[in-house]
Regions:
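Conserved glycine-rich cofactor-binding loop
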Residues: 13-15
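Conserved glycine-rich Rossmann-like NAD(P)H-binding loop of the short-chain dehydrogenase/reductase
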Residues: 29-45
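Rossmann-fold cofactor-recognition segment
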Residues: 49-67
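Conserved mid-core segment of classical short-chain dehydrogenase/reductases
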Residues: 84, 90-106, 149
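Active-site helix of classical SDR
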Residues: 120, 156
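Residue(s) in the substrate-gating loop at a strand-loop-helix junction
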Residues: 140
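C-terminal helical subdomain
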Residues: 180, 195-232
Length: 247
């Protein structure tokens, strides 16, 4: 049996990213790279994983600095070989602000779409020659059909979903696997102060679904699974009704 790949968490403070890393360590991964801004301040996150027996490396990473992505990721792959990359960075943004502050709208789309495209493209280019590695990408139910109530964030996720779906097809047969995760509302730091939407999940529940999908070799997973039917219903909702849909 092949030894599990080292784990790279891009967004090393992400609640979901850390939960996924914990499950991969329990499944046999021995090395975890936590990449985030202020990487010197990841003691708590490191302790969670070392307690499970992992060797943890922290690395400075700014998702918005797309010019640095290639060199950073090439360095990780040079040190560790093929990795299981959990692309867990992102922002929710402020929809009301984004409607009037163009710079804020652009910042949300840059982090949630442009930076993701950059990371995913570089990872694909680095892992293809190795014919190994897995990449976990987080889309959202918000991108299944963009709503008036959160169209800036939703449109970024819609773009990411389309890009990741196409990239997964491009990687077919290469030895590199991409898992596209489509969660609903996740109760965590990013959504503090917000009322949970129906079919909400916790970071741990999302990570359980990710770990199971990876183990099964699946290419996509909805969390919870009932969201797939909801997305189908959303697609045929008349636009005048959809326009009034809440977050």
């Amino acid at each position: 049996m092949a030894h599990p790949n080292p784990v790279l968490v891009l967004g090393g403070r992400s609640e979901i990213g850390l939960e996924v890393a914990e499950r991969l360590v329990r499944a046999g991964a021995r090395t975890v790279v936590l990449a985030a801004r202020r990487s010197h301040d990841l003691a708590g996150e490191t302790a969670r994983l070392t307690a499970l027996g992992a060797d943890v490396e922290t690395a400075e990473f700014d998702a918005d600095d797309v010019g640095a992505h290639e060199g950073f990721l090439a360095g990780v792959v040079a040190r560790h070989g093929a990795v299981d990359a959990v692309v867990a960075f992102g922002v929710l943004g402020d929809q009301a602000r984004a409607e009037h502050d163009v710079a804020h709208a652009l910042a949300v789309v840059h982090t949630d779409f442009v930076a993701q495209v950059s990371v995913l493209s570089h990872l694909a280019n680095l892992l293809r020659p190795l014919r190994a590695g897995r990449v976990v990408v987080f889309s959202s139910i918000a991108g299944a059909r963009v709503r008036r109530a959160n169209y800036v964030y939703g449109s970024a996720k819609a773009g990411l979903d389309g890009f990741a779906s196409g990239l997964a097809d491009a990687l077919h047969g290469s030895g590199v696997r991409l898992l596209l995760v489509r969660p609903g509302f996740v109760v965590g730091r990013m959504t503090t102060g917000m009322s949970p939407a129906p079919l909400a999940s916790t970071p741990a529940q999302v990570a359980d679904a990710v770990a199971a999908a990876l183990a099964a070799g699946r290419g996509e997973v909805w969390v919870p699974g009932t969201l797939r039917a909801l997305a189908a219903a959303m697609a045929v909702t008349p636009r005048p009704v959809w326009r009034r849909a809440p977050r």
